[in-house]
Amino acid sequence: MTKFKNKILMGASVGRYSDAGFTLIELLVVIGIIAILAGVVIVAINPARQFAQARDTQRWSNVNSILNAIGQNMVDNHGNFTCGAGALPTTTMELGSGANNYNIEPCIVPTYISVMPMDPSTGTSTATGYSVVYDPTTRRTTVGATGEVTNPISVTR
């Protein structure tokens, strides 16, 4: 039995340390690779462009909403747009309550649309960021906006 005990004790490594684990260099290399991959992914995704595209999508939706409200007003009034601000402008005018703007809000809100849409970046109640023009020859109305990625944004009906 003594021989067995001696063999066990001799096999024990007193004073030696284990080789398990990672060295500092290995950890730094892995962190460097992760940083490079993260940089490539961020550049590929381009968050600024993604946000700009999201705002342009909102502009497309708002332009369609305004044009639908104008169309519904015209349907209810036998093909004529009825508004206290007067007939639809035949030259391009910005929508809003400002001095040189066409104030369409009282004519379509809340009957045809719940709230007057405003540009997601710069729109205010005095200058919504959306414009309107009516062509009496073709009887078509165009509502538009300035986009960030897609420029211009406009819908004609």
Regions found by a protein language model. Name each.
Residues M1-F22:
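N-terminal leader/signal peptides at the extreme start of proteins
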Residues K3, L24, T91-M93:
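N-terminal compositionally biased, intrinsically disordered segments and leader/signal-like regions
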Residues Y17-I45:
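N-terminal single-pass transmembrane signal-anchor helix
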Residues A35, I66-L67:
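Short, contiguous, well-ordered secondary-structure segments
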Residues A44-V63:
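Aliphatic-rich helix starts adjacent to a transmembrane/signal segment
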Residues N68-T142, T156:
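Extracellular/periplasmic head regions of type IV pilus-like filament subunits
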Residues G144-R157:
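Short, low-complexity, Pro/Ser/Thr/Gly-rich segments in the mature regions of secreted, periplasmic
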